[in-house]
From Swiss-Prot:
The keyword GTP-binding does not apply. The modification Phosphoserine is found at S20. It comes from the Eukaryota. There is a cross-link at K12, K61, K65 (Glycyl lysine isopeptide (Lys-Gly) (interchain with G-Cter in SUMO2)). Coiled coil: none annotated. This is X antigen family member 1. Belongs to the GAGE family.
Amino acid sequence: MESPKKKNQQLKVGILHLGSRQKKIRIQLRSQCATWKVICKSCISQTPGINLDLGSGVKVKIIPKEEHCKMPEAGEEQPQV
């Protein structure tokens, strides 16, 4: 039987700490924490949000829950602002 500690380490739960004046966003994964740089605050649909460069070619957009944003299809290049 697995110990609860081992089971918890396998979960990857991200907690975002956002601040309107911050240029960086901290994402905490249980016991580990990393900070990523904000690269821009718009996307192709001009919906308010924050694009993050997570390194290794991974980019993520965070948008308000009530907003909808048309994200580019896989393989398309997103214009940088």
